[in-house]
Amino acid sequence: MQGYRNYSRLQLELTENRLLVIGPNGIGKSNLLEAIELLGSLRSHRASSDQDLIHWEEQRALLRAIADDTEKLELELRRQGGRQARRNGKTLTRQLDLIGPLRCVGFSALDLNLVRGEPALRRQWLDRVVQQLEPIYSDLISRFNKLLRQRSQLWRQWRHIPIQERDSLLDAFDVQMALVSTRIHRRRSRALARLEPLAARWQETLSKHKERLRLDYQPGSQLEGEEAEEPWRLAIETQLLGQRSEEERLGSCRIGPHRDEVRLLLNDSEARRFGSAGQQRTVVLALKLAELELVGELCGEPPLLLLDDVLAELDPGRQLLLLEAVGEKHQCLVSATHLEGFQDEWQQQSQIIEAGSLNRSEEVR
């Protein structure tokens, strides 16, 4: 790793199944886990721009990893804009082709807002899950966001567009947005249907059979019946047409995946509104364990689990359940401020890295 966040240069060999990165807050533990997640998924949940990821003295950041002893992955971020991805020394024309060998599931203290936070947080979580299962999904999200921006720009320029051209412009947008929206809705719906029984089982276990969890997908378009693409596409086109007057008044699109909501129901009550803080944290834990299980099941191998300062936010009982659930199956990288809370067995079987040494040494084993 070169020129990434607060790291000028770092070479780290992660040999054990359990890895503990220990050190005070603000020293760069989260940056290390973020770099691994970025290389595995091409996304950072902590930064909106690559500019935020590049060391302030550098013009580029370079991430490299060897996964499964065979796959060499590289991602270069440039301050002037643009990325370059390489796999086994070959420059990739599509960044998405980097995804696969280093699948990760991240769980940080920020994820604890998943239940009580805004709908956008649940959409982003669901999108990360779908992308792990179908890397091409990122293209759909990018296409939809671009169409949404262009449509908003169209409304801002509406008065300057000749009247005879307006309907044809909107018709063209409706066709494209309906198609992309349908494909996003279908993938989100399928992913939630797969996640729900797993999350429900984990919630039942974590609550000692006291709580029943349901995941209720509420698409931002009015959709009925089976997930067939053509009926859903036509339904969305019809809704976009019917909403034009309202859309013109508001200057924004009211139909589509950007309006989706995922309701999390505990014993048929909305966890966001009626769940206690402890119940909400249990729901997040159940969702993350379900995600970990689903990605491993559908992708054929257990993903790397990144636990970023999250154990300190869980009570001892939930900490123990999480660490037991991870077991020996997953390689797990955990950041924490201290070793308290980790069982002696976990510490003895873990590679322990002092975070304070990372910036002073080029190579840590």
From Swiss-Prot:
What domain of life is recorded for the organism? Bacteria
Q: Which SUPFAM superfamilies match?
A: P-loop containing nucleoside triphosphate hydrolases (SSF52540)
Tell me a GO cellular component. Answer: cytoplasm
**Where does the chain bind ATP?**
G23, P24, N25, G26, I27, G28, K29, S30
Q: Where in the cell is it found?
A: Cytoplasm
What function is annotated for this protein?
Answer: The RecF protein is involved in DNA metabolism; it is required for DNA replication and normal SOS inducibility. RecF binds preferentially to single-stranded, linear DNA. It also seems to bind ATP.
**PANTHER family xrefs:** DNA REPLICATION AND REPAIR PROTEIN RECF
Its name, as the record gives it, is DNA replication and repair protein RecF
Q: Which source organism does the UniProt entry give? A: Prochlorococcus marinus (strain MIT 9313)
